[in-house]
Amino acid sequence: DFQPREPVNPLLFAMKKTKMMIEVQLTQEYTGESIHTCFMPFDDNMISLLRHPTENIVGIAGVSNVGDMKNWCGSEMTKANWYAFGKLASNLSLSKETIAREWLAKNFDTTDPRFINPMTRVLLESHEAVVRYMMPLGLHHIFAAGHHYGPEPWCNIKGGRDDWQPWYYHKADAQGLGFNRTYDGEFHDVQPGFGVNIGSGNARLYPDSLYNIYNKVETCPEQLLLWFHHVAWNHRMHNGETMWDALCHTYDQGVREAEAF
């Protein structure tokens, strides 16, 4: 549901006989509610899918809401995402930097490099910073229930749907953190231990080339680790840190990056 970082949806690989459009979100529902600067042109995986589409991927759509603010978009910098979507919809060969520089020059009516250069850097680095200080390492759905601007991983709305609750996704317990989406030979319905000791099987929905990467803790990209695995707090990351230390340091890195902007 438009989290700061998600793997490409497996439906794009599986629905071979159905024409599809890829939907992205211009409105920053989970990336600072159009208040935080978060420049989000398509990532390289999405660009690859769109540049070399199968016959059933026929277009793209952008989810957006205009508000009652003077600039429609919530904040001055949020407009960059609307502009980037329009540019990439018509020309996928454009680089993120080209779009950022062009938008800054047009929106602020200046070509002064003392402004364009540092603000281009802010735009290009902003998304990774947001991921780091909000939901790093594949963590997801830990936002507040009444709004999606800040975190509320402890949220547990009485009578609410389980799969709308943050705890359903982060699965934090004494052993570890993260949602187990691995495949053990069969797909499982929701039951005790689901998403922790019992994998949902979601990883098997991907082509073998991705399944073989995502399904193992050892090979899963660390930026998606907690999306696909329930990971022990003392699990050693590639840099030798425990998962807990890496999580704390990544949050801190994101905050420091945002402060530097």
Tell me what each language-model feature is.
Residues 1-64:
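Active-site capping/gating regions of soluble enzymes
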Residues 53-261:
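Catalytic domains of carbohydrate-active enzymes that cleave complex glycans
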